[in-house]
Amino acid sequence: MSNDTVIKQIGNTPLIKLKQASELTQCNIFGKAEYFNPGESVKDRAALFIIENAIKNKKIKKGGIIVEGTAGNTGIGLGVVAKIYGFSLKIVIPKTQSIEKKQALKALGAELIEVDAAPYIDPKNYIK
């Protein structure tokens, strides 16, 4: 699959009719199957928008570095898109995050900077 094809797949996910919810409400209700995105998350869309917007506005150029603090799917979405566009990715991630999540990020080429977990209001959340 070409890089262009992968990019085009982001957000191009099917709608699935939710039968029981539709029957209960007497209207058609659909769910968007975002797990069909390349990174298997709705966050692929956000990552694509952020990176393409940064390119368009000349905030980043080929070979640039993206740094993101995340414990979740945003990092995986950024990993998918950054790899395609040729950017390096550094993810600041809590040490407590699952091994599987860390392995997925590394497989996408991300460098992980592991930090102690801290609440968002704690200044330690922003420093190593």
Model-predicted segments: where are they?
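PLP-dependent amino-acid enzyme catalytic core
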Residues: 1-128
